[in-house]
């Protein structure tokens, strides 16, 4: 077992668990967008950013990709962590202004509008001649680039049919 401190609370998890696993085990809520329990950790969305405090210094990192280590001290909610998450949300909102999940999180973080410029409108890719008679509707203004579609296709279905 690995013991670590999360927001001044002792947590214990199995060897090989991530900091996100430890937070969940301790009942500490950490927001995620790209985390899918049955897929390998990815860290693309950066919403699970936490602070790792060590020997008087600290660094921000993703909880879903960081292996829990003995004696680790984790901070999940302070000014630095909140500011990092707010910037991530604003960037994602500029990229995907129609994504409802982003608006829910933005409201929780007090964000009404992104301060960053919106992404230019993406045109649909042309359909190749002789392509099958079906169409997958892409919604680029809703895509938050979490990689979940791609990773499920690759890791679970093993079709390797979707690219990022």
Mark where each language-model region is.
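N-terminal cofactor/phosphate-binding cores enriched in small/glycine residues
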Residues: 11-70, 84
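A generic secondary-structure micro-motif detector
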Residues: 9-10, 129
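Fe-S ferredoxin-like electron-transfer domains
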Residues: 46, 54-164
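Eukaryote-biased recognition of intrinsically disordered, low-complexity regulatory segments
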Residues: 1-9
């Amino acid at each position: 077992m690995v013991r670590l401190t999360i927001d001044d609370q002792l947590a214990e998890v199995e060897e090989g668990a991530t900091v996100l696993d430890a937070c969940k085990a301790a009942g500490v809520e950490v927001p995620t967008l790209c985390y899918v329990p049955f897929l390998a950790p990815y860290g693309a969305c950066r919403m699970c950013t936490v602070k790792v405090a060590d020997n008087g210094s600290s660094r921000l990192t993703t909880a879903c990709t960081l292996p829990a280590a003995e004696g680790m001290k984790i901070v999940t909610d302070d000014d630095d962590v909140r500011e990092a998450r707010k910037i991530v949300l604003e960037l994602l909102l500029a990229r995907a202004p129609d994504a409802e999940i982003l608006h829910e999180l933005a409201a929780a973080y007090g964000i009404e509008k992104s301060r960053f410029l919106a992404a230019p409108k993406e045109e649909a890719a042309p359909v190749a001649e002789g392509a099958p008679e079906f169409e997958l509707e892409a919604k680029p203004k809703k895509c938050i680039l979490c990689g979940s579609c791609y990773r499920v296709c690759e890791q679970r279905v093993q079709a390797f049919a979707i690219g990022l």
